[in-house]
């Protein structure tokens, strides 16, 4: 799907520093899918690199977090900042497709994502995982990542694993489905606000 030519700059950089994390996220919605990701959580780096590659959104992300405790604060705060950065880069959302969906396989796993960038924050997530963690990444944080991101992105997000047994494959399929849904949703197809309300 070639990106519609436009003269807008759809990029943003957001910083967040708390007693638990120090995060910088920079995104370019009209990028080439290049990324530099250092989250402090290796498996999350892998997922976010995949998201960047398959969404076409350039990402530069750095996080220094209290991973000596666990990964919760880093994963949650990265999602918060990523959502904020993408929302800022979207600007007034004129001409965007707004909606996106994808069903993506990863070997035996199959995941579906549907999203709406219409300004209404809601996340529905269904994905059972047989493993509690992968290389220091708590699998319960997958849902929390998407819930946190949907809030600051102001997006309605539905994610579901339809098939699968391997936890790694199921999570990767979810992130790739999200990537392709996002690629479609941010794609510019016109010049109007995609809502009868006149704003989103």
Curated annotation (Swiss-Prot):
Catalysed reaction, written as an equation: D-erythro-1-(imidazol-4-yl)glycerol 3-phosphate = 3-(imidazol-4-yl)-2-oxopropyl phosphate + H2O
Gene Ontology molecular function terms on file: imidazoleglycerol-phosphate dehydratase activity
EC identifiers of the protein: 4.2.1.19
Keywords assigned: Amino-acid biosynthesis, Cytoplasm, Histidine biosynthesis, Lyase
Primary enzyme class: lyase
GO CC annotations, alphabetized: cytoplasm
A Pfam family the protein falls into: IGPD
CDD domains associated with the record: IGPD (cd07914)
Single GO BP term: L-histidine biosynthetic process
Localization in the cell: Cytoplasm
Involved pathway(s): Amino-acid biosynthesis; L-histidine biosynthesis; L-histidine from 5-phospho-alpha-D-ribose 1-diphosphate: step 6/9
Matching Gene3D superfamilies: Imidazole glycerol phosphate dehydratase, domain 1
Similarity comment: family membership: Belongs to the imidazoleglycerol-phosphate dehydratase family.
Name assigned to this protein: Imidazoleglycerol-phosphate dehydratase
Organism: Chlorobium phaeobacteroides (strain BS1)
